[in-house]
Amino acid sequence: MHNRPEFPKRAVVTAGMPYGNKGLHFGHIAGVFVPADVYARFLRDRIGAGNVLFVSGTDCFGSPINEGYRKLVEAGDFDGTIADYVQMNHDAQKAALDAYDISLDIFEGSGIGLSGVKQQEMTDAFITRLYDNGWLEKLSTPQFYDAQAGTFLNGRQVIGRCPVQGCKSEKAYADECDLGHQYDPVDLIAPKSAITGQTPEMREVSNWYFELPRFHDLIAAHIEQVAGMCGTRRVLVDEVESFLAPPIIYIQEKFADDFSAIEAELPPHSVLPAEKGKSSFGVEFASIAERERAVEVMHAHGLRFRTGKTLVPFRLTGNIEWGVKAPDLDGTLPDATVWCWPESLWAPIAFSQAALEESGRDATDWRAWWCSDDARVYQFIGQDNIYFYGVAQTALWQGTQTGHEPHVDGTGDELRQTTLVPNYHILFMGKKASSSGAIKPPMAAELLDHYTPEQLRAHWISLGLGVKPASFSPKVLDPNANEKAPDPVLKESALLANIFNRI
């Protein structure tokens, strides 16, 4: 006989954080919010509505917002502040979520409402704890600078090609591509400024970094435990394990002679022959620092290469003025702000605090939801974000533990590892669509001109995105649709209506 499922006494359900540079497209709703909403409703039925917090909010900061705001202002289409711009998009996002009957306990933002206040407090405490525990280092690294515009460039203000071996992303930005791969800015291939279209310079900038490579063994131990748990999705395990590979540089075999000519200048390494069917051999190093020294040598000699996935220091701060203010840890970076990705990882804690306080409970009780063995946090995410939640967040949570060497999971009043629920891509007409890509997704509000929320919710849940990518192909938006063919979007709701009519 199978064991009956066990449920926590309290549960938090999170549904990611859409950037505050636009309304919600169908992928936001179908890929994350609807699955999270279904599970939150299920948990309320199992353990009681008062024991479930379903939280989310607008990601108010980051280069996509700066870029979107800049373009609108330059085009003369917006004359408010950047805060006004974010609030406008937040309001549109909330309206769409309400229209789809997403039953959130709170939807504010990392810079909006009480959640924004809590987020600044949480950011100060979180980063200070990591610093006090000895897990931060200040690094001076090259950053893109647009001399024509007279400004440093971050994130999506730079566009190029991903340097990670085998990556098939459509676009790559300053230090990450649209498939979530992380790399050093200097490795980005063919960078161009999104502001002027010019090739940017590289200038040294100091920032705080979390020493992610030091947590390799703890991350590996955690994902091994997760892999053995019932319900774990294979895409989570595969993606996390791919980042645990050693530091490797890949070089096409046609450049083997050029490599041999400079090999003596490289730090200690091992040469790995090209795998069957591959055109590149590998050069493996013992540490990320040694690989970076090798990268400098190869750049100096003009040798072409690509880097493999591995753990690299995780940047916490930046120099974008519009951002959550970073604590001034040693008096040297008083104007630093926090990169949007790390602060978005602990933002759901701030949302939980705000939700508790706004419902008449005590915000300080958040630890009973995030730091307790009888509670669990379920985080619904897209597969492109597994690196941030499954790799970086795992280690950040471990890095906040105090009084002992870090453990795989927290004890006492320490943060517990969360349960990640990643979904595969939801395609549009069989192709990947994104707001920044060639194929634009339909907006969530637009679809309600053709379907009811119930019809869309039933269809999206039926796609099984936890198992495989699936296509959303609404007949009303398909120019090649057969007039006589049924609309695939209506199949599930028609079936349910037929069943209910027979009862």
Predicted regions: what they are:
Residues 50-69, 105, 389:
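Short, well-structured secondary-structure segments
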Residues 133-214:
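Cys/His-rich short segments
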Residues 69, 106-120, 382:
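Conserved short loop/turn motifs at secondary-structure junctions
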Residues 2-49, 53-56, 121, 192-503:
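Structured secondary-structure scaffolds
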Residues 88-105:
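A glycine-rich helix N-cap at a beta->alpha junction
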Residues 68-88:
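A charged helix-plus-loop insertion that forms the helical arch/lid used to bind
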Residues 130:
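P-loop/Walker A NTP-binding region and its immediately flanking N-terminal helices
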